[in-house]
Design a protein with these regions (language model features):
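P-loop/Walker A phosphate-binding loop and immediately adjacent motor/lid segment at beta-alpha junctions
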Residues: 81-89, 139-170
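Conserved, mostly hydrophobic/aromatic
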Residues: 21, 73, 129
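N-terminal [4Fe-4S]-dependent radical SAM core
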Residues: 1-22, 35-41, 165-166, 170
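Conserved Radical SAM active-site core
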Residues: 2-3, 17, 35-117, 121-122
Length: 170
């Protein structure tokens, strides 16, 4: 997997102060996307141990609430993202994981993206999912943590427990 950037002390992509990993590669290509430079899977730089350590250093700070995966689409980078999320949950159990994706919660839950991959396992690593493609005709600048009104901010843990989508409230 390649990535474009690791943003530190971010307060725009999830609750609290966060570190954000901007992955390369997105299959959605939403018109007027804010990050079209992240669409190509080969763009950016290879995600390596140095990048992982940079993230872990940030997550070890008391004031950092957690990590946000964005891009690109983290779900399109399933294996590397899943393994990194798993390691973060083990090393930093009190930190939250947010994930932005163009896929819907239902698509991920049904494993309908690519057969043979454990998307339920991925969902179990995520605390809050911001789902759905960006739709320029539904753009709303007053929405918190999302760009268009079709997107949802989902409490994944509660959604899995209640077997229905439960929106995350701030």
């Amino acid at each position: 997997m390649n990535y474009h950037n690791i943003t530190k002390d971010d307060m725009n992509n999830g609750d609290g102060v966060r570190v954000v990993l901007w992955v390369s590669g997105c299959s959605h290509h939403c018109p007027e996307c804010q990050n079209p430079q992240t669409w190509c899977f080969d763009s950016g730089i290879p995600f390596d141990d140095k990048a992982k350590e940079e993230i872990f250093t940030e997550l070890s700070k008391d004031y950092v609430s957690g990590i946000t995966f964005s891009g690109g689409d983290p779900v399109d980078n399933f294996l590397t993202v899943f393994l990194l999320m798993k390691e973060i949950k083990e090393k930093f159990p009190d930190k939250t994981i947010w994930c932005y994706t163009g896929y819907t919660y239902e698509q991920i839950l049904s494993c309908s993206i690519k057969k043979g991959l454990n998307y339920l396992g991925l969902l179990k690593m995520i605390d809050v999912l911001v789902d759905g493609e960006y739709k320029k005709d539904l753009r709303d600048l007053d929405l918190k943590w999302r760009g268009s009104s079709n997107q949802r901010v989902i409490d994944v843990k509660k959604s899995l427990a209640e077997n229905k989508v439960v929106l995350w409230c701030d």
